[in-house]
A protein has these predicted regions:
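Mixed-charge, Lys/Arg-enriched low-complexity segments
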Residues: 4-8, 55-95
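Low-complexity, intrinsically disordered short peptide segments enriched in small/polar/basic residues
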Residues: 15, 37, 49-50, 70, ...
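Short aromatic-glycine-(Arg/Gly/Cys) micro-motifs in beta-strand/loop hairpins
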Residues: 35-65
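Negatively charged, low-complexity tracts enriched in Asp/Glu with abundant Ser/Thr
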Residues: 1-35, 61-62, 93-95
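Hydrophobic beta-strand residues in large extracellular and virion-surface proteins
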Residues: 17, 27-29, 38-40, 52-54, ...
Length: 95
């Protein structure tokens, strides 16, 4: 289950919350910067090896792929923002 502090760390001006399914321990968000979609799923570290698994898909794609594994929600948010910065830089360099 996500704590109130973890949910607060998901900045609503940077992310659009698509859905939050507390029973399944995941939150689906969209980056307003890149328009990419993300699922932050909390799981059993004994099973997954990490407490949080991050899934990703681009706009127009149907399925998510496993993007990263993290130790906490702040690390997850940082990973998403880093991906957005990379995508923005790559897009700028492709012009």
């Amino acid at each position: 289950m996500f704590t109130k502090r973890e949910l607060k760390s998901i900045n609503k001006s940077y992310f659009n919350v698509v859905r939050y399914v507390s029973e399944m321990n995941y939150i689906e968000i969209q980056s307003r910067c890149s328009k990419d979609y993300w699922i932050i799923q909390k799981g059993d570290p004994a099973y997954y090896g990490y407490p949080i698994i991050l899934y990703h898909k681009h706009p127009g794609q149907q399925y998510y792929h496993r993007h990263w594994q993290c130790y906490n929600v702040n690390q997850t948010i940082s990973s998403i923002k880093s991906h957005d910065a990379y995508k923005k830089l790559r897009k700028w360099n492709d012009k």
